[in-house]
Amino acid sequence: MVKLFLIIASAFFTACVSRAPQKAITKKKNRMTCFERLDTAEANKRILECSEKEEMEFPGIHLIEPATDCEFVDSMGYTVYLCKNDSGYLKTRWKAGNLFGEYRYYFLNGNVQETGEYFLREFNCGIWREYDIDGNLIKETDMDKPYKGYSWQNIMLFIKKRNIDLYDEETNIDRYVDESNVPYWYITWFDRGIKAFHDIIIDARNGYVVKDGISHR
């Protein structure tokens, strides 16, 4: 379902997760501090269990490289993806039927390094925060800021008007800022009636439809 992504988010987005993180955020000397931590022992245990299960199903699968990631459903019904590399742990989680997921990246000691939210099919959204190893906030980015002129709520109304099935796996929504610093929304979906894809590009400054066409793929 997810082109995972993203993103989606970083080259490291072959990631991992355990249970929902426990966190506390305080402000100290005008600096935000986050004490969210990942239980690294539990994360390592999860990855090992997944590795052992895969080895039973596919003997020799990890002879060349050991398992570094794991996917499971937690007690709250979230699908969790957990991954470890030389610099830290990546954890994402999302729930069936939801359009958005949570992103966390942790230092090797378990302290949180980056937090954010993402749309399951293509883009990061909301407030993303980066912390140093002591939990001090060093960067905060509003991913939605360039698209305030034509927001997600406007996109939802547009999709409803066009009768686009947002939950169809062939439907994708992306957004980007071009080299001229102009923000755009990009929507594509499959019309089963005519067996073709529709592509729409919308200027996020004013909602003007720049492109509305059919592409045969």
Region spans (language model):
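Bacterial Sec-dependent N-terminal signal peptides
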Residues: 1-29
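Periodic aromatic/glycine/histidine/acidic cluster detector
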Residues: 19-107, 111-120, 125-130, 137-144, ...
